[in-house]
Amino acid sequence: VVGSDSGTDDSLVDAQPGNAAGARRTLVERLQADGVLTDPRLREALSRLDRGVLLPRAYVRRSEPGTDPVVWELLDGTHPNDRAEWQELVYSGESVLVQRDGEPPESQVRGAVSGGRMTAMSTFIPYTVEVLQRMRIAAGHGYLDLGTGPGVSLALAAALTGPRRAVGVERDEHMAAFAQNNLERLGAGATMVAGDALDGHAPRAPYDRIHSGIGVPCLPSAWMDQLAPGGRLLTTLTTRTPSWPGRCLVTRTATGRIEAVLEGGPRGHRPLYGYTWLTAQHHLHRIADRPGRPRTTTFTPPADEAYGFWLSAAYLVPGVFRHFQADTLAVVAPEDDSWAVAGPGDGTVHVHGPRDVWAELENIHNLWTRAGSPDRFYVDIPADGGQQHVTSGTGPDALQWVLPPLAAMPGQPA
């Protein structure tokens, strides 16, 4: 997992039986071919990281979508009947589910279980690679990883910083201890602590690089306080919709000034513990059966890749969820029992409910266009911990909004 200068015992690189080295090679080659992996140091770290040590067991869903309760199966990478499927999953690059209902990982029993929710997982590896490359981690940097989970991202970061420079904070004490033990088996030179990610980790501050593996509604003041001059912080800014995440890059200049840029993107981290996303699960069958009243429309929503528009919609058309599995664009305001479903390119839209979410999207599109179709926004972070304002610029047509405070969100128990 780490370079030769970190003291890694090469005998640990393939701690699990089977062709893990070949699976790692295939994953790295695919990431390179897709243009995701460009940093040679990170390529070396990925080539050496035995994910099987950090993800020795994994849950897979066995029931059909919509089934309640969900049926899961826990795969054990050391069991001959599970080995092939487990290894394919662990090295697929997909997110790997590793904990159900906060269970101690050491108590997990291979086999089928029913119900419950997943409380820890690894991150989609292309996104992990994208984040780590954007962080520009150098040897010797002090690195803080927040919401670390099983420790995959932390292990890769530690390979870039060198030993004893990377620390992770995980709220679940069972997962923190489990990850620390596995990191030690790898000789990763990283430290895990149990605690509230919103508090950062003051004992090792300041940090040259801070990465948050949880989405937050605004930027916690503790994170700002623990960012060193010249430092970079990367986090997901989350709203109540999972459909359009924001990615915020915070830098502290050499003179100590904080600057923050917010952009939309195709994916982000899940929100902090206790934060509830909107869901349209109970509306989907109704939308399919009775899409609503038809009417003509001249509004053609921009492409999915117009991340600036969709990020603006997440804040300025609040409480709306996109149904990505629909054949055409469908947006739902579940708490208002309202939705809009675009026609199949025929200039029509079907609307339902007291809230005209289609008209709201059209209005925001007009404002976004008038503002210059911005794809990035600027976050003002007052030193006194006051409201954090977002703007697309300084002109009279600039889009702007205020980030919701952390105080309005459920806390994270340590």
PLM feature segments, named:
Residues V2-L144, S153, G385-P413:
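Class I SAM-dependent transferase core
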Residues L42, R57-R62, Q226-L227, L237, ...:
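A short, aromatic/hydrophobic, helix- or strand-capping loop or linear motif
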Residues D336-A414:
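C-terminal target-recognition/interaction regions appended to catalytic cores
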